[in-house]
Amino acid sequence: MILCRGLFMAVIGIDLGTTNSCVAVMEGGDAKAIENSEGARTTPSIVAFTDSEVLVGDPAKRQATTNAKNTIYASKRLIGRRYQDTRDIKTSYDIVSAKNGDAWIKVRDKDYSPSQIGALILEKMKETAERHLGCKVEKAVITVPAYFDDAQRQATKDAGRIAGLDVIRIINEPTAAALAYGLNKSDKQKVIAVYDLGGGTFDVSILEIADGVFEVKSTNGDTMLGGEDFDHAIMEYLMDDFKKSTGIDLHSDAMAMQRIKEAAEKAKIELSSRMETDINLPFLSSDSTGPKHLSLKLTRATFENLVSDLVKRTIEPCKKALKDAGISADKIDEVVLVGGMTRVPKIIQTVKEFFGKEPHKGVNPDEVVAIGAAIQGGILAGDVRDVLLLDVTPLSLGIETLGGVFTPLIERNTTIPTKKSQVFSTAEDGQTAVTIKVFQGERKMANDNKLLGQFSLEGIPPAPRGMPQIEVTFDIDANGIVHVSAKDKASGKEQAIRIQSSGGLTDDEIQNMIKEAESKAEEDEKRKKFVEVKNNAENLVHSTEKSLKEHGDKISNADKLDIENAIRDLKDCISKDNIEDTDTMQNKLDHLMKVSMKLGEALYSNTNNATAGDNNTTDTGSSSNSDGSKVVDSDYQEIDKKDGK
């Protein structure tokens, strides 16, 4: 596949979502979401491992019930997180601790990082774009929740690298949505709030838009609040009801849990447009008395009662974002709803009550983030002009100082990219080395915040405590990724790192995963070829057997035996179902095609003979039929109307 011509065409925008993902591209000055191979503009963020292949998207979702243990969903909730922080997350698959303490996913006998799972979804998005554009894509802008910390942003970027993408920018989801909303409205100054409730995370951002400048004033959120939690609330309600009526606890039944999860998600969606919905799950379980079924009605009122605490949890971040921006709710000109969960009537009502105005519904909540990412790609490529995006860092960044105190160097909601330095000193006499521990968060004590990483500055000349001057510099790039350096002013000794947490993937691990992904791509292509050859072989066997049954009497016994042997050989090869036999199967298929041509030759020969028998005529010289009579060829002999000749 050729590389897309023109830089702007090669930059795609990807919304890597918890529940669904979407890819968009700039075309003719406008950004549009692209349909996948199944004809939908959103793709379920689900990956399934079967005995023979890896499935992504709708094919993975369709088989989830029968393969619950090996079907991975909502992996975005694990990306860049420590195992100890994910113990409350309930899934049908196994979450395990990696050697570095990160949360990984166990499938059969192998452990996968969430970045690897994310990479498989990104590969699907990449393929979708390439199929649409007709050329190879290498560059992408990928969105993340605004409240993602540095480790989660790094892990998302790693996923892009594993998928074979050059991630030229990481952009916050609410900011991307604001770009899509306000691209053609930026001539009018206004302040907007983007309320983004997706499948796994919640963000709220306050932005000021004027003269092509999109300036984020503040952002807040909750990376563990989203549609998955609403689904789980319904699931618990259904399982409690089932246990009361049958005495059976379904929590340890992976297949039943998967069926309940699918039913809960469907009910949640239906209750956005209906006042009640029926949930029927026959043969959900069984005991000594026979099969047990789940059947009940779920009303919108019951659903809203189940999720009321979850809805309330979105309000506190809204209050904090307004406070940090120095703006009251009544000064917000427009509230933009983003994420599939914002279709829920209770959410719409809550947003309306808090901000005192009807939310804006002019954007597609499922596609707007990817479209905004594509616009950002257009900006970076120079295809979209006169637009400036000023984003912020969501959390304060700083270091641990004497007594375990967290000392921020960059406060939250600081516009990025940014750089800031501060001078520190030693805590003990004669100290020749210092360890710099970098944290992100809002708590007063360092250990209550997220440790991003640490490094040491050595070779400091011995001196009384408080005498050495150590300059610590924080540099946050436009992706929100942190770089830190420390320099001893006296000796000139300096140590600089791009923050990589005590967890996270090393460059070697990423390179190995890239190689594995490339190898998987080769395996997938090999599997695809095998399936195509096998399908062709089965079709040929079927059609040849049918023809042999109907017309076998028209060929010699020797030819018939050759065809029967070729069919048997090809059937034996098909029954082995061995991908390594692809070339052998193709050869046997070719052989059957060759010998079965005898059937075709015999059929056409008989047809031609029959035709010749019916129409065997001559020109003016005439010819004899088997009975010796003369026949005149009507195609060549005109009949004289007068004498009838």
From Swiss-Prot:
Keyword Nucleus listed: no
InterPro entries, A to Z: ATPase_NBD (IPR043129), Chaperone_DnaK (IPR012725), Heat_shock_70_CS (IPR018181), HSP70_C_sf (IPR029048), HSP70_peptide-bd_sf (IPR029047), Hsp_70_fam (IPR013126)
UniProt keyword terms in alphabetical order: ATP-binding, Chaperone, Nucleotide-binding, Phosphoprotein, Stress response
Gene3D superfamilies on file: 1.20.1270.10, 3.30.420.40, Actin, Chain A, domain 4, Substrate Binding Domain Of DNAk, Chain A, domain 1
Biased composition (Basic and acidic residues): 630-645
Biased composition (Low complexity): 606-629
SUPFAM superfamilies per record: Actin-like ATPase domain, Heat shock protein 70kD (HSP70), C-terminal subdomain, Heat shock protein 70kD (HSP70), peptide-binding domain
Induction or repression: By stress conditions e.g. heat shock.
UniProt KW Nucleotide-binding keyword: yes
Positions of the UniProt region annotated as Disordered: 606-645
Modified residue annotations for Phosphothreonine: T201
GO molecular function: ATP binding; ATP-dependent protein folding chaperone; unfolded protein binding
Function comment: Acts as a chaperone.
Family the entry assigns: Belongs to the heat shock protein 70 family.
Name of the protein this chain belongs to: Chaperone protein DnaK
Species assigned in the record: Ehrlichia ruminantium (strain Welgevonden)
Organism lineage: Bacteria, Pseudomonadati, Pseudomonadota, Alphaproteobacteria, Rickettsiales
Gene: dnaK
